C-alpha cells in the first residue's frame, strides 16, 4: 500500500505516534488509508448538508476495512459570486481545489480517495486532482435541489430569478413579483435544479465511470442519496483491493463518452472547459475540433432547464443518466467496454436501464434534433473556437447577422444593456473577460439574463471570451479563443461592425475585408488592466487559453 511509507518500519515510529494521537491502533496500520475530500461549506446551498454525508462515507469505509481521514476543500458559490468582482475567483478556485487535494493526499501518502463535491468548480477541481494523483477514487456528490414553484404551481429555479431582474429593470415585472420568485426559486439544499454546470458535471461523473449510477440525478433530500454515500464508502475499499486507479478507468474513449452524453443531454457549455482540463491532467490530447465531430453525430435527447420546464427531479424520474446512455448505446455512440468504479463495464451498468418518461428523455428514434446540444463555432473571430449551448438557443436566432455593440468588461455590458444601448438585431460583444484578461473568465449570466428578461432573447446574440453559467440560455457564444488579452481577433471588433453567427454551419465571422482585418490585427495592442490581487496576478500569468481548458501552464507564457 502507498500508505506503508508512513506506517511501516521502525523508522516510522514518529509517524505512527502522531497517527496514534489521531486515534489509530495497531490494527489500523494494517488497513488502507482512505482520504475523504469533503467540500462542506455553510455559504453554498449545494454543500450545507455534506457534513453528514462525510460521516456516512467514513462509517462505511470503517465497516469495509479501511481507515478514513476527512479533510475539507474550499468552494465558491457561482450564483453568489455572480455579477461582481467575486466572479474573478470562481474558475481559479478550480485550480486551488485540485492543488490542495494533491497536497493532502501526497503529503500523507493516502491509498485512495472519496470525493464529495457538488457545485460548479468543486466537481472538476476534484476530478482534476484525481486524474493527477492516479489512485483509486470514487465520487459521490451532494445531489441537486428540487425545483421551486410559484403560487400558481409553475416550476422556477435560480435562472428564473436572474432573468426576473432584467424584467424588473425594463418595467416588465414589479419588485413584489420579483420577491415572490426570490423566496421560492431555491427551496432546499442541493445544487441548482436545472441542467446547469454543477449538475452537468455530476451527471458526467457517471459516464466517466468514477461515480455510481444515480450520482447525477438523485435529489439531495432523497434518502437514496444517503444510501449512495454509504455505497461509495464501501466501494472505495474494493477499488483499493482491485487496484483500479483513475487512469485505468478514464482514457480517451472515456472522454469521448463524456462529451457524447454531455451533448445528448444538453449540458452546460462550461463542461467543455472542464472536460478539456480533466483530459489534460490525465495526459490525453483532446482537440476542440473533435468535440464538434461528436456533436454532429450525437442527437439531442434531453432539454432540461434552462431549455425547458423540466428539472433534475424529472430526469431522475424518467430513468436518469443510465437511461440516456442506454439510448445512445442503441446507435453505437458509446464505448461500452470502459471500466467503472462499480467494477462493471459501462455496458453492464446500463444494461437494464429504460426510459420511464419519453417527454423528458426522448428515445433515440425521436430526438429533439439529430445533432447535439453543444456546438463549437470557428471563424475569423474565433480561430481556436467558441462554444454555444445550441439546445438552449431559440430557433429564430440560430442564424443571426447583426451589428456589434462592444463592451470591455461585464460591468460595462450590464450598464449598457440595462441602459438601453442594446437593441433588437444587435450582437453584444463582451471581451477582456477571458482566463487571462478577466482574469478568471467570469460567467456572463447577469448580462444574458438581462437580455432574456428584457424580451430580447430571440433578437440579440452575445459573444464573449468569457464564459456562461449553465443557467444561461439564448444565442450566447463563449470561450472565444484566443481571448482579447492574448491578442485574439475579438479585440479588434468595433461598434457597428457586422457579425455573422451561423450555429448550424458552425461559423462565426467578422464581416470586414481581409485587408481591413489584417490592418486591424497588425495595429492591435491588447488592453492591460491592473490586477490588485497577488493570487489573480499569478493566475493571469500562467493560465492557458479556453481551448486548452484554461489550465495553468508549467511556465509563464
Curated annotation (Swiss-Prot):
GO molecular function: 2 iron, 2 sulfur cluster binding; dihydroxy-acid dehydratase activity; magnesium ion binding
Record: residues binding Mg(2+): 78, 120-121, 443
Entry EC number(s): 4.2.1.9
Keywords: 2Fe-2S, Amino-acid biosynthesis, Branched-chain amino acid biosynthesis, Iron, Iron-sulfur, Lyase, Magnesium, Metal-binding
InterPro entries: Dihydro-acid_dehy_C (IPR042096), DihydroxyA_deHydtase (IPR004404), DiOHA_6PGluconate_deHydtase_CS (IPR020558), ILV_EDD_C (IPR056740), ILV_EDD_N (IPR000581), IlvD/EDD_N (IPR037237)
Family matches, as Pfam families: ILV_EDD_C (PF24877), ILVD_EDD_N (PF00920)
Family stated for the protein in its record: Belongs to the IlvD/Edd family.
HAMAP family: IlvD (MF_00012)
PANTHER family, per the entry: D-XYLONATE DEHYDRATASE (PTHR43661), D-XYLONATE DEHYDRATASE YAGF-RELATED (PTHR43661:SF3)
The protein's name: Dihydroxy-acid dehydratase
Organism: Persephonella marina (strain DSM 14350 / EX-H1)
High-level lineage: Bacteria, Pseudomonadati, Aquificota, Aquificia, Aquificales
Amino acid at each position: 500500500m502507498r500508505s506503508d511509507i508512513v506506517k511501516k518500519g521502525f523508522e516510522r515510529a514518529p509517524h505512527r505516534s502522531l497517527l496514534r494521537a489521531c486515534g489509530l491502533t495497531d490494527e489500523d496500520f494494517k488497513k488502507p488509508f482512505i482520504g475523504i475530500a469533503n467540500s462542506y461549506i455553510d455559504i453554498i446551498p449545494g454543500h450545507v448538508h455534506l457534513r453528514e454525508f462525510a460521516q456516512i462515507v467514513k462509517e462505511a469505509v470503517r465497516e469495509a476495512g479501511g481507515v478514513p481521514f476527512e479533510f475539507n476543500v474550499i468552494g465558491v458559490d457561482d450564483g453568489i459570486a455572480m455579477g461582481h468582482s467575486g466572479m474573478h475567483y470562481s474558475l481559479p478556485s478550480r485550480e486551488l481545489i485540485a492543488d490542495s487535494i494533491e497536497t493532502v493526499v501526497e503529503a500523507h501518502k493516502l491509498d485512495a480517495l472519496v470525493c464529495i463535491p457538488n457545485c460548479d468548480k468543486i466537481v472538476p477541481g476534484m476530478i482534476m486532482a484525481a486524474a493527477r494523483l492516479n489512485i483509486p477514487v470514487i465520487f459521490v456528490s451532494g445531489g441537486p435541489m428540487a425545483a421551486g414553484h410559484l403560487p400558481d404551481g409553475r416550476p422556477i429555479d435560480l435562472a428564473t430569478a436572474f432573468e426576473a431582474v432584467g424584467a424588473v429593470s425594463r418595467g416588465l415585472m414589479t419588485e413584489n413579483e420579483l420577491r415572490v420568485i426570490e423566496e421560492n426559486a431555491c427551496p432546499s439544499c442541493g445544487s441548482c435544479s436545472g441542467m446547469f454546470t454543477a449538475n452537468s458535471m455530476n451527471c458526467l461523473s457517471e459516464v466517466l465511470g468514477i461515480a455510481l449510477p444515480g450520482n447525477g440525478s438523485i435529489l439531495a433530500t432523497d434518502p437514496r442519496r444517503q444510501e449512495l454515500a454509504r455505497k461509495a464508502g464501501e466501494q472505495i475499499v474494493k477499488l483499493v483491493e482491485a487496484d483500479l486507479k483513475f487512469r485505468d478507468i478514464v482514457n480517451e474513449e472515456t472522454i469521448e463518452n463524456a462529451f457524447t452524453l454531455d451533448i445528448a443531454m444538453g449540458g452546460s457549455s462550461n463542461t467543455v472547459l472542464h472536460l478539456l482540463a480533466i483530459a489534460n491532467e490525465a495526459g490525453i490530447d483532446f482537440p476542440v475540433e473533435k468535440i464538434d465531430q461528436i456533436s454532429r453525430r450525437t442527437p439531442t435527447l434531453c432539454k432540461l432547464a434552462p431549455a425547458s420546464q423540466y428539472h433534475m427531479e424529472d430526469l431522475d424520474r424518467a430513468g436518469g443518466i443510465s437511461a440516456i446512455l442506454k439510448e445512445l448505446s442503441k446507435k453505437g455512440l458509446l464505448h461500452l467496454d470502459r471500466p467503472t468504479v462499480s467494477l462493471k463495464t459501462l455496458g453492464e451498468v446500463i444494461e437494464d436501464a429504460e426510459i420511464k418518461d419519453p417527454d423528458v428523455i426522448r428515445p433515440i428514434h425521436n430526438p429533439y434534433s439529430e445533432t447535439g446540444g453543444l456546438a463549437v463555432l470557428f471563424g475569423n473571430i474565433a480561430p481556436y473556437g467558441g462554444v454555444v449551448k445550441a439546445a438552449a438557443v431559440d430557433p429564430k436566432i440560430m442564424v443571426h447577422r447583426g451589428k456589434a455593440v462592444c463592451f470591455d468588461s461585464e460591468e460595462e455590458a450590464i450598464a449598457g444593456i440595462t441602459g438601453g444601448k442594446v437593441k433588437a438585431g444587435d450582437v453584444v460583444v463582451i471581451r477582456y473577460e477571458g482566463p487571462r484578461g478577466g482574469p478568471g473568465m467570469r460567467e456572463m449570466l447577469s448580462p444574458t439574463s438581462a437580455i432574456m428578461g428584457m424580451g430580447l432573447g430571440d433578437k440579440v446574440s452575445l459573444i464573449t471570451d468569457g464564459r456562461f453559467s449553465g443557467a444561461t440560455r439564448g444565442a450566447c457564444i463563449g470561450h472565444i479563443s484566443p481571448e482579447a488579452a492574448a491578442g485574439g481577433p475579438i479585440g479588434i471588433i468595433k461598434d457597428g461592425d457586422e457579425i455573422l453567427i451561423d450555429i448550424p454551419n458552425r461559423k462565426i465571422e467578422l464581416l470586414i475585408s481581409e485587408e481591413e482585418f489584417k490592418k486591424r490585427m497588425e495595429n492591435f495592442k491588447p488592453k492591460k488592466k491592473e490586477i490588485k490581487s497577488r493570487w489573480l496576478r499569478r493566475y493571469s500569468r500562467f493560465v492557458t487559453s479556453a481551448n486548452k481548458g484554461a489550465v495553468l501552464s508549467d511556465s509563464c507564457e
